[in-house]
Amino acid sequence: MIQAFTRLNVADNTGAKEVMCIKVLGGSKRRYAQVGDVIIASVKKATPTAKVKKGKVVKAVIVRTAKEIHRENGSLIRFDDNAAVILDDKREPIGTRIFGPIAREVRYSGFMKIVSLAPEVV
């Protein structure tokens, strides 16, 4: 579960290393976000040659959470970290590579480009 002020790793090659959640999109009083949800985030750490500079406010989709995900078949899945992929205004990923596994729930949310770039979908 991701909420305001949660820090997430960035799982793409935009050059940003860490983002902080500012707002969870999808309702006026929505507090928590899970895998596949879009958030508004601020870039907190970035490399000097990054496409996205430190301090920039961006949209991102969550691809991994440390909080377990309950699936319809009764199984649970959780990851070691919280991670997101930075999006542009058209909800397409800015980066051209995705690092690490991503959850299958990202596909159900309609981010097929991210799923096709990912090395592993769990």
Swiss-Prot record:
- Cross-referenced SMART domains, in alphabetical order? Ribosomal_L14
PROSITE patterns linked: RIBOSOMAL_L14
Q: What is the top-level taxon of the source organism?
A: Bacteria
Task: Give Gene Ontology CC terms.
Answer: cytosolic large ribosomal subunit
- GO terms of molecular function: large ribosomal subunit rRNA binding; structural constituent of ribosome
Q: Does the keyword Ribosomal protein apply?
A: yes
User: Which NCBIfam families has this protein been placed in?
Assistant: rplN_bact
Q: What is this protein called?
A: Large ribosomal subunit protein uL14
